[in-house]
C-alpha cells in the first residue's frame, strides 16, 4: 500500500452502486466485490479495526483499486459474478467446476429423436434437466428406451436406413425410419416420454392401465402383456427416483464448512424425481460463514444459467432478497429461495447437509495426505518453495505409430483434470521418443501461456531430462525445476530412479517415502492418460486406414461416405444396402466396404 493514497482515493469516490477490483503491485486482481454504496464499502476495509485476519492480509497487498459504477445493485451483482469467473481472484470464493450441465434433448422432427445435449441450446426442440453428470443422462435414456421405444439414433443414420436396425429387433425402437409405426402412434409414445420427464409419470401409468384393460377386454393378450410390462418398468423407476409428492423442479443446497475448506452439495429434483447430486469444493482464502459462502455460490453458479423455480437452502444469506430479485429477473419468472424450518423440505436439507459433510471430510483427508506428500517432495528435492503445481509428461506409441504425448497436472488439491492436455505427435521419425517429447514441450510452453509448473516431471532418465532442458532454454524458461523418473528393473514400483536436473548422481530415496509415492501417482496418471489418448487415436486412425485400403474407394468417395453416413461409427454399423445407396458406391463396392469391417 506504499504508493496507494487511500484518503485521496476515497475523497473522489462515488456513493453509487458498483463493483470494485483490488489489485496488487503487479496489477494482478486480488479481490472482486460489489457494493450498494461503493464509498462506504471500500472505506470499511481501511477504517475498521475488527476485520478478519484474511482481510488484513488482503489490505496489506492492495496497490490500486479499480471501480465500475452500475445503475443498480442488481447490475453490480451480475457484473461481480462475471468478473470473478473471468479473473479468478485469489481472495474470492472460486468454483473449480463451472462446466455446462448435460440435458436430455427431444428434437422437433416429425419423428423426434431422444438424445444427450451439452452446451448452448441452439437446436429447436425440448430440453429436460439439467442432470448432475453425463452418467445420469445415459442411465435415464437407457431406462426411457426400455419403456418407450423412441428412436435415439443420429439423423444421418436414421435417414439412410432401408431396413430396421438391431434396436428394433430387441424392442428398443419401433423403426420409424422404415415406416413400421404410424406418426400418430409414435406421437403417443413421445407424449408419454415428455410427461414422464416432466414428472407426470403417474398419469402415464394411468393411461397405460386403461390401454391394458382395453386390450385384455378385446382378448388381445399379447398387447395387454406389452402394456403390463411397461407399467411394471415405470413403477420400478418411480420407486428408484421418487422423492416428493410435490411435482416441482427444485434444487436443494447444503453447505459444510471448515476454516479453509468448504463443500456445497446440490441435489437436482425435477418433477418430484431425484436426478442425483453434485459436489462442489470452492476454493477459499480465509474464514467465511455458511451464509456468505452460499450467497457467493448462488451468484456464481446460477447467474447466466437456467435456474429452477425453487432453491431450498440450508442457510439463509443476508442478501437473499437481492438474489431472489436478480434470479427472477434473469429467468423471466418468479424464483423462490427458501430456508425451511419444518415439513418435508427440512428432510431434504438434512440429506444435502449429510452428503456435504461426508464429502468435505473425505476431501480433507485426501488433501491432508497430498499436502504431506508435497511437503516431503519439497524436502527431498530441496525446493525453495512448496510446489504449487506439478506437470508430468509421458509419450505413448506402438512401434512408433499413432504417437501421443500426455500432460497431467497436480496441485495441492490433487489432479486438475481440466488442465490435462493431449498432443498428437506428427512429423517425427517413428519411435523417436526424444522428438515426441520435444514437440510436446514446445507446444506446451512456446507461447508462454497459462500457469507454469514449479516442478516438471518427465517419465524417463537423463536423456529425457537433457532434452527437456534444451527445449526450455530455447524458449527462455529457466525457473522450472525438472525431474526425471526412470523405471527400475522389471518396472517394479519402488525401484524407480530419480534424476534431478543439474545433478550428476540420482536422488536417493527409500521405497516407503511419501515423496516417491506422489511421484509414482503422478507418473502413473500421466501414463494412464497417454494410453487412453493413444487408444483413441489408434482406433480412429485404424478405421480410416481400413477405408483407405479399399480398392475403388478414393478420397472423394470416402469423403462422401463419411459425410452422408455421419462418420466412421455409422459406416461400421451400416449394411450393404445402406452403403450402396450412397452416390458413387456400387453394390459390389458396398460389399467390399462391409466385409472390411465385419470379418
Curated annotation (Swiss-Prot):
Cellular component terms per the entry's GO annotation: cytoplasm; excinuclease repair complex
CDD domains membership: GIY-YIG_UvrC_Cho
Boundaries of every GIY-YIG domain copy: 15-93
Compartment(s): Cytoplasm
InterPro entries with a match to the protein in the record: GIY-YIG_endonuc, GIY-YIG_endonuc_sf, GIY-YIG_UvrC_Cho, Hlx-hairpin-Hlx_DNA-bd_motif, RuvA_2-like, UVR_dom, UVR_dom_sf, UvrABC_protein_C
SUPFAM superfamilies in alphabetical order: C-terminal UvrC-binding domain of UvrB, GIY-YIG endonuclease, RuvA domain 2-like
Main subcellular location of this protein, as a coarse class: cytoplasm
Residue stretches making up the UVR domain: 202-237
GO MF entries: DNA binding; excinuclease ABC activity
SMART domains on file: GIYc, HhH1
Assigned keywords, A-Z: Cytoplasm, DNA damage, DNA excision, DNA repair, Excision nuclease, SOS response
Any one GO BP annotation for this protein: SOS response
Role according to the record: The UvrABC repair system catalyzes the recognition and processing of DNA lesions. UvrC both incises the 5' and 3' sides of the lesion. The N-terminal half is responsible for the 3' incision and the C-terminal half is responsible for the 5' incision.
Subunit annotation: Interacts with UvrB in an incision complex.
Record family assignment: Belongs to the UvrC family.
PANTHER family: UVRABC SYSTEM PROTEIN C (PTHR30562:SF1), UVRC/OXIDOREDUCTASE (PTHR30562)
Name of the protein: UvrABC system protein C
Native organism taxonomy: Bacteria, Pseudomonadati, Pseudomonadota, Gammaproteobacteria, Chromatiales
Amino acid at each position: 500500500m506504499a504508493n496507494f493514497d487511500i484518503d485521496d482515493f476515497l475523497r473522489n469516490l462515488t456513493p453509487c452502486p458498483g463493483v470494485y477490483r483490488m489489485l496488487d503491485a503487479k496489477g494482478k486482481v486480488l479481490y472482486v466485490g460489489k457494493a450498494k454504496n461503493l464509498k462506504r464499502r471500500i472505506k470499511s476495509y481501511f477504517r475498521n479495526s475488527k476485520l478478519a485476519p484474511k482481510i488484513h492480509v488482503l489490505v496489506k497487498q492492495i496497490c490500486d483499486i479499480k471501480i465500475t459504477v452500475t445503475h443498480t445493485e442488481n447490475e453490480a451483482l451480475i457484473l461481480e459474478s462475471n468478473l470473478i469467473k473471468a479473473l479468478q481472484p485469489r481472495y474470492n470464493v472460486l468454483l473449480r467446476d463451472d462446466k455446462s450441465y448435460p440435458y436430455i434433448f427431444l428434437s422437433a422432427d416429425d419423428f423426434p429423436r431422444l438424445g444427450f445435449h451439452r452446451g448452448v441450446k441452439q437446436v429447436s426442440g425440448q430440453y429436460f434437466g439439467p442432470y448432475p453428470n453425463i452418467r445420469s443422462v445415459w442411465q435415464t435414456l437407457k431406462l426411457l428406451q426400455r419403456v418407450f421405444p423412441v428412436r435415439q439414433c443420429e439423423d444421418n443414420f436414421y435417414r439412410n436406413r432401408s431396413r430396421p436396425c438391431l434396436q428394433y429387433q430387441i424392442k428398443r425402437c419401433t423403426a420409424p425410419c422404415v415406416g413400421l409405426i404410424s406418426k400418430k402412434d409414435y406421437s403417443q409414445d413421445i407424449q408419454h416420454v415428455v410427461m414422464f420427464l416432466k414428472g407426470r409419470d403417474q398419469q402415464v401409468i394411468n393411461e397405460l392401465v386403461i390401454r391394458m384393460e382395453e386390450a385384455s377386454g378385446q382378448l388381445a393378450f399379447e398387447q395387454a402383456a406389452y402394456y403390463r410390462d411397461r407399467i411394471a418398468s415405470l413403477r420400478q423407476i418411480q420407486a428408484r427416483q421418487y422423492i416428493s409428492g410435490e411435482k416441482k423442479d427444485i434444487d436443494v443446497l447444503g453447505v459444510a464448512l471448515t476454516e479453509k475448506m468448504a463443500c456445497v452439495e446440490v441435489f437436482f429434483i425435477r418433477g418430484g424425481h431425484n436426478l442425483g447430486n453434485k459436489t462442489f469444493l470452492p476454493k477459499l482464502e480465509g474464514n467465511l460463514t455458511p451464509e456468505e459462502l452460499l450467497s457467493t455460490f448462488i451468484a456464481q453458479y446460477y447467474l447466466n444459467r437456467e435456474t429452477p423455480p425453487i432453491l431450498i437452502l440450508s442457510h439463509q444469506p443476508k442478501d437473499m432478497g437481492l438474489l431472489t430479485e436478480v434470479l427472477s429477473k434473469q429467468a423471466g419468472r418468479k424464483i423462490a429461495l427458501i430456508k425451511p424450518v419444518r415439513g418435508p423440505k427440512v428432510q431434504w436439507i438434512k440429506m444435502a447437509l449429510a452428503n456435504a459433510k461426508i464429502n468435505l471430510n473425505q476431501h480433507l483427508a485426501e488433501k491432508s495426505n497430498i499436502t504431506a506428500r508435497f511437503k516431503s517432495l519439497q524436502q527431498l528435492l530441496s525446493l525453495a518453495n512448496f510446489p504449487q503445481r506439478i506437470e508430468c509428461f509421458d509419450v505413448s506409441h506402438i512401434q512408433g505409430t499413432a504417437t501421443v504425448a500426455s500432460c497431467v497436472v497436480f496441485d495441492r488439491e490433487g489432479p486438475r483434470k481440466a488442465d490435462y492436455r493431449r498432443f498428437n505427435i506428427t512429423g517425427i521419425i517413428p519411435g523417436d521418443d526424444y522428438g515426441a517429447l520435444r514437440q510436446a514441450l514446445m507446444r506446451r510452453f512456446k507461447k508462454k501461456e497459462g500457469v507454469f509448473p514449479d516442478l516438471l516431471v518427465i517419465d524417463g532418465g537423463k536423456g529425457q531430462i537433457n532434452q527437456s532442458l534444451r527445449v526450455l532454454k530455447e524458449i527462455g524458461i529457466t525457473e522450472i525445476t525438472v525431474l526425471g523418473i526412470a523405471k527400475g528393473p522389471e518396472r517394479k514400483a519402488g525401484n524407480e530412479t530419480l534424476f534431478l536436473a543439474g545433478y550428476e548422481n540420482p536422488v536417493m530415496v527409500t521405497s516407503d517415502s511419501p515423496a516417491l509415492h506422489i511421484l509414482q501417482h503422478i507418473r502413473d496418471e500421466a501414463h494412464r492418460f497417454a494410453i487412453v489418448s493413444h487408444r483413441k487415436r489408434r482406433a480412429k486412425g485404424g478405421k480410416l486406414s481400413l477405408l483407405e485400403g479399399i480398392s475403388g474407394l478414393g478420397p472423394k468417395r470416402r469423403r462422401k461416405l463419411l459425410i452422408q453416413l455421419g462418420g466412421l461409427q455409422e459406416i461400421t454399423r451400416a449394411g450393404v444396402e445402406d452403403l450402396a445407396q450412397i452416390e458413387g458406391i456400387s453394390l459390389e463396392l458396398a460389399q467390399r466396404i462391409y466385409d472390411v469391417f465385419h470379418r
